[in-house]
């Protein structure tokens, strides 16, 4: 606690805001708090607060999820008690837990505690990305297959954010973009990137595929492009897109492209991915051992 308070004296850090005249501070305590439980409470507070409309910025860089500890089984009850106490202080800043969990930002947040399957997939993606960037490879494709409800969106946002956290910790420049061809989802991702300070530090890191293709060249590829809902990518010219295959054009402009794909969604969209084109990309990923399948249903 002393270490955190001392950080307030450093003007470059967010803790310095605690010394401003209009700063407010909530101090939370519980007789069963230990380090692991306190960290999990902090993680969930960050996760919840990021989903609140009135919160503009979550300053802590990353979460620190804990595994098994005593009294882990009390986490939900203790957290709910804390949240109810905070709601008594300010109902606008601390909405009901059900309202938080219903919000689109909460559902897509990179601060979710990952399942073992998601964690394994995230570690593998980061490992493959690091190797590709180290070897200056281009047009690398990582293909994630998963039906609706298997946690592709959370895996996508979590891996995207983790790569930025690691780059910041290691003082590395990183050009990493998150693409989705869906108006509502792009708004959600933009709000997440803004609240986590990514847009302020790195510029517009979230965009539609066509915007990304038009703004980047094959000669200067970005490091990584994450594509959510890849079934929405176009395979023909439409509106402002003049090309023939958006996935191919994205791969031309990124050293590594990570796509989240649900083949079952193809039947319900205007875009129709020819089976042989889809299989060609999946096979490319399989040959390079870059194919991951999410099976565990989370809904």
Give each language-model segment a name.
Residues 3-127:
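Boundary/linker segments flanking structured domains
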Residues 14-17, 213-214, 247:
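Catalytic micro-motifs at enzyme active sites that drive phosphoryl/nucleotidyl and oxygen chemistry
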Residues 15-22, 199, 280-287:
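Short, conserved catalytic or adaptor-binding loops enriched in Gly and charged residues
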Residues 32-37, 211-215, 296-299:
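A short acidic, often aromatic-flanked loop/helix-cap motif at beta-alpha or helix-coil junctions
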Residues 112-115, 122, 126-135, 145-150, ...:
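Conserved helicase motor core of SF1/SF2 NTP-dependent helicases
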Residues 141:
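Walker A (P-loop) ATP-phosphate-binding motif of ABC ATPase nucleotide-binding domains
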């Amino acid at each position: 606690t002393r270490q955190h308070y001392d950080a307030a004296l450093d003007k470059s850090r967010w803790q310095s805001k605690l010394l401003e005249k209009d700063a407010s501070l909530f101090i939370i305590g519980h007789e069963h708090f230990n380090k692991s439980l306190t960290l999990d409470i902090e993680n969930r507070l960050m996760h919840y607060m990021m989903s609140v409309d009135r919160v503009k910025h979550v300053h802590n860089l990353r979460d620190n999820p804990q595994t098994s500890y005593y009294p882990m089984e009390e986490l939900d009850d203790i957290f709910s008690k804390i949240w109810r106490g905070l709601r008594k202080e300010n109902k606008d800043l601390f909405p009901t837990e059900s309202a938080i969990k219903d919000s689109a930002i909460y559902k897509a947040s990179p601060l979710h505690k990952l399942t073992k399957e998601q964690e394994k997939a995230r570690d593998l993606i980061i490992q493959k990305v690091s190797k590709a960037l180290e070897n200056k490879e281009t047009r690398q494709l990582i293909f994630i297959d998963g039906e609706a409800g298997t946690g592709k969106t959370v895996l996508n946002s979590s891996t995207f954010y983790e790569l930025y956290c690691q780059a910041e910790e290691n003082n590395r420049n990183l050009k990493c973009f998150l693409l989705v061809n869906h108006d509502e989802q792009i708004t959600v991702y933009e709000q997440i990137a803004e609240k986590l300070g990514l847009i302020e530090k790195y510029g517009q890191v979230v965009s539609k595929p066509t915007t990304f293709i038009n703004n980047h060249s094959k000669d200067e590829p970005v490091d990584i492009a994450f594509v959510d809902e890849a079934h929405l990518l176009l395979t023909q010219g439409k509106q402002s897109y003049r090309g023939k295959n958006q996935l191919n054009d994205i791969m031309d402009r990124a050293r590594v492209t990570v796509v989240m794909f649900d083949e079952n969604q193809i039947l319900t969209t205007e875009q129709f991915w020819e089976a042989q084109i889809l299989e060609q990309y999946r096979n490319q990923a399989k040959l390079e051992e870059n194919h991951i399948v999410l099976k565990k249903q989370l809904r």
